[in-house]
A protein has these predicted regions:
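N-terminal signal-anchor/first transmembrane alpha helix
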Residues: 1-28, 99, 109, 113
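Membrane-embedded alpha-helices of multi-pass transport/permease systems
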Residues: 19-30, 91-95, 124-128, 137, ...
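Transmembrane alpha-helix signature in integral membrane proteins
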Residues: 69-99
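Transmembrane alpha-helices
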Residues: 9, 113, 117, 169, ...
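Short loop segments and helix-boundary regions at transmembrane helix junctions
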Residues: 2, 96-122, 126, 131-136
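Short membrane-interfacial helix/loop motifs at transmembrane-helix boundaries
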Residues: 19-69, 137-138
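Membrane-helix interface segments
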Residues: 103-111, 139-140, 159, 189, ...
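Membrane-interfacial helix termini and adjacent extracytoplasmic/periplasmic loops
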Residues: 42, 49-54, 127-168, 202
């Protein structure tokens, strides 16, 4: 009985927090638009029964989503942002995870804390901080002007560049942590064996380290995408 309760609890949690809200959203998606509160007219009524619901059931809302150009542009734009952001996050996150895995063991908890610590603050505060960094009067433009790399402030806010920066910053730990976990468990003797067999450090990295860390890469890409 105790074992049953231990197994049933997570399923009940899943039912309450995921399946029931999903069923509510599905019900709304099959409803008709109405100028009311809430702004839809449910097709299902307990008084009329399931038969009346099935006789009136249509997927007009879903057909509209697949035929309207506005939604297609939104879908494609979302996929583009997700793909580019995932690629950038991987390129930035892998070297960080590799450096953490190769750092002395006494340093690793501190490095892990530095990765996680910023995300203990409110997301809203971090958004305002990035606005202060990326605005035309922000720190980034001030540094670039001081270095003489630009003559006029760059416009970064309200552009796709700002979107990519925000997405990469937000999801970077979700890329770093799985890759770090995979690299930390890797047997260092495999690298030594590859070098003994004639591989250079770079060749051993591409032929041994990257393949062995592939599960972490895949997990990180799934989490970020």
């Amino acid at each position: 009985m105790r074992r049953f309760l231990l197994i049933a609890f997570p399923y009940a949690w899943l039912l309450a927090l995921f399946l029931i809200p999903f069923a509510i959203v599905l019900k709304i998606s099959l409803s008709d638009v109405a100028l009311a509160r809430p702004p839809y007219m449910p097709q299902f009524s307990w008084d009329e029964g399931i038969g009346a619901f099935l006789s009136q059931l249509d997927f007009e809302n879903f057909v509209f989503l697949t035929t309207d150009d506005l939604y297609w542009k939104a879908y494609l734009s979302s996929l583009k942002i997700a793909a580019i952001s995932t690629t950038i996050t991987l390129l930035v996150g892998y070297p960080i995870a590799y450096a953490m895995a190769r750092a002395p063991e006494s340093w690793r908890p501190t490095l892990m804390m530095l990765i996680i610590l910023p995300f203990w603050t409110s997301f809203l505060i971090r958004v305002y901080a990035w606005q202060g960094i990326l605005s035309q009067e922000g720190y980034l433009n001030q540094v670039l002007l001081w270095l003489g790399l630009i003559s006029t402030p760059l416009t970064i806010l309200n552009t796709s560049t700002a979107v990519y920066i925000g997405v990469v910053y937000t999801y970077l730990p979700f890329m770093i942590l799985p890759i770090y976990a995979a690299l930390e468990k890797m047997d260092g003797s495999l690298i030594e064996a590859a070098e003994d067999l004639g591989c250079s450090r770079s060749s051993a990295f591409w032929l041994v380290t990257i393949p062995l860390s592939r599960p972490g890469i895949v997990a990180g890409c799934f989490l970020v995408f």
